[in-house]
Amino acid sequence: MSSKVQQEIADLKKLIRKWDKEYYVDSLPSVEDFVYDKHILRLQELESKYPEYKTLDSPTLKFGSDLLNDFKEVEHSAPILSLDKVYDLDLLKSWIDKIDFNNSFNISVEPKIDGCSIVLYYKDGVLEKALTRGNGKFGNDVTINVRTIRYIPLFLDEKVDLVLRGEVYITKENFLKINKFLEKPYTNSRNLASGILRRVDSREVANFPLNIFIYDFLNAGLEFKTNDLATARLKKLGFKVNPLIRFFDLKNSIGEVLNYIADIIKKRDSFEYEIDGVVLKVSDFALRERLGYTAHHPKWAMAYKFEALSDFSRVNSIVVQVGRSGKITPVANIDKVFVSGAFITSATLHNQDYIRSIGLNVGDVVKVSRRGDVIPAVEMVINKFSTGFFKVPDNCPACKTAVVKEGAHFFCPNNNCPSVAVERIKYFCSKNCMDIEGFSDKIISFLFEKKFIFSEIDLYTFDFYKLLEFKGFKDRKINNLINSIEASKKKPFSKLLLSMGIKDLGENTIMLLFLNNLNSFSKLFKLCQDRYFAFSTLLKIKGIGEKIALNIIEAFNDSVMLNKFKFFENLEFKMEEVVAIDGENKLLAGKKFCITGTFNGYSRSIVIDKLKNKGAIFNTCVTGSLDFLIVGEKAGSKLKKALSLNIKIMSFEDIKSYLD
């Protein structure tokens, strides 16, 4: 155990030092703060548990450093500390709750600018020097460059000694303009601002529109009791202070503080500058001193950090993928970025029309987001470094069959296409469908490539012990795969029906079928033998349109699909599912719901599952066809949209009885 712990500590220290250099020296970080913080916390945890392995060179005892050899190192007059940070609002509230305000609640809230930290030293009202934060003890002297920033006063009206902290930044608009002309574009405005500030020739720096907000002062050159008075004085002296800083006192509640944070989050995309969080500070300076400091941060301040909603990256290549329906989807392989809590190395480009509309090709710098915090997507071209736009090939990359266009998408029409076949098997085994544990995409692809399986039914006939001759497959693993296959035979009919991959047939439509007495294979098969009668019958079900009705009828007249159903029936799969709706649950049955907010004692997934079991149908977004929106605490934008569409609102109290 000890050697493993020592090795993990050594690996963490090596990795953190690498990231420190990338962030502070190179201005080219490869990971987001969220990831860095997790590794620091893990190292702190290990060093606390095994103090005998904590060394004097540990990153937990030091600060990151932006010191460069190109600039003179100068000692700060006092340690320049970092901020403690949280990524969870509950933890932020907990931090506020722990502060003893002595019946004098006082806190300031301001956006956390995503820029380059700077410390300004004024002597007798004259800017004497400007240092980077450096390692907290020493910083690089960038005075000559800082003097070119027009928003920093070189002389003050009063002969005072001040030490101020500020954040140098560049606006989103100027970032895009400047990045176009750089041989090696920066991935974000923070790195660009940092890079400009560290240019050796100050004449070059003067050509760039750097900006600054002053957010703190570190000495007693001006005597004030509270942060709001100090901020007002700084503004009067000519310093630029963020106008969004807001001060809360006894007249306010913690709820109002959290509401203001929510308002900043909501409006962040409209700001002219990038922010990566908000900063909360105790306003009363006497209380600040009582709360004190750690070696790393003041105890009277806390940063609530956001996970990035989007970021910029370069497109290295574009590939086309073939899905289970044969749909051809172009995908961009990009430089790794961290967005909404996850690393992204690829992003969907939707279809040929979309690529043409944004004019994208390999080599371009693009804006990447995670739509709905799930699917990575390229939103727009930021810098065009290529000519023309990417064109989807005329032939399927897997089977070379000529592709056909249906609407905005290209499709491979070959039902025997190997990519289509393997994607169908992956879908069949997926968590939302048959949920066959152990059958990862990698294992399914391996079985397919070795020609052990060609379709879903082969999973139930293959002798898995043949895998013993391959690396990575031992008795235990093979037995687990076999047990998972056997367990799948007990899944409800709704899961089997979903797993068959009938076009546009999802969980909600299946529930509608079941609620209308079409809850078995035999009933669906019998209905669909008379196509015209089936079509009119299905259209009478609210929520089923012409397209899905035709797809259902086609599927239950397709010989390949029917043979699969017969195969599973012979294996004694469940071919019928009873949906029992009693009088109490009639309100829910077949109705379309959406959910927003939090629910005391219940996760959203539990609420959804319990109501689904009683016949409710859930949508992920608010549309005009919705019957009810279930609203918990801290409801989001869905509530506003639902009200504008006159959709009925249900509270937690309205649904509580259905959750028992």
UniProtKB/Swiss-Prot annotation:
Give GO BP annotations, semicolon-separated.
DNA repair; DNA replication
According to its UniProt record, the EC number is 6.5.1.2
Q: Which GO terms describe its molecular function?
A: DNA binding; DNA ligase (NAD+) activity; metal ion binding
Protein known as: DNA ligase
Query: What keywords are annotated for this sequence in UniProt?
Result: DNA damage, DNA repair, DNA replication, Ligase, Magnesium, Manganese, Metal-binding, NAD, Zinc
Which SMART domains does the entry mention? Answer: BRCT (SM00292), HhH1 (SM00278), LIGANc (SM00532)
Q: Which InterPro entries match?
A: BRCT_dom, BRCT_dom_sf, DNA_ligase, DNAligase_adenylation, DNAligase_N, Hlx-hairpin-Hlx_DNA-bd_motif, NA-bd_OB-fold, NAD_DNA_ligase_OB
Gene3D superfamilies attached to this UniProt entry: 5' to 3' exonuclease, C-terminal subdomain, BRCT domain, DNA ligase/mRNA capping enzyme, Helix hairpin bin, Nucleic acid-binding proteins
The BRCT domain covers 583-660
- Per the entry, which co-factors are needed? Mg(2+); Mn(2+)
Key word DNA repair present in the record?
A: yes
Record function comment: DNA ligase that catalyzes the formation of phosphodiester linkages between 5'-phosphoryl and 3'-hydroxyl groups in double-stranded DNA using NAD as a coenzyme and as the energy source for the reaction. It is essential for DNA replication and repair of damaged DNA.
Keyword Magnesium belongs to the record = yes
Binding positions for NAD(+) per the UniProt entry: 33-37, 82-83, 110, 133, 167, 281, 305
| Positions annotated as active site in the UniProt record | 112 (n6-amp-lysine intermediate)
Q: Which sites bind Zn(2+)?
A: 396, 399, 412, 417
**Which reaction(s) does its UniProt entry say it catalyses?**
NAD(+) + (deoxyribonucleotide)n-3'-hydroxyl + 5'-phospho-(deoxyribonucleotide)m = (deoxyribonucleotide)n+m + AMP + beta-nicotinamide D-nucleotide
Q: Which family does it belong to?
A: Belongs to the NAD-dependent DNA ligase family. LigA subfamily.
Segments passing through the bilayer: none
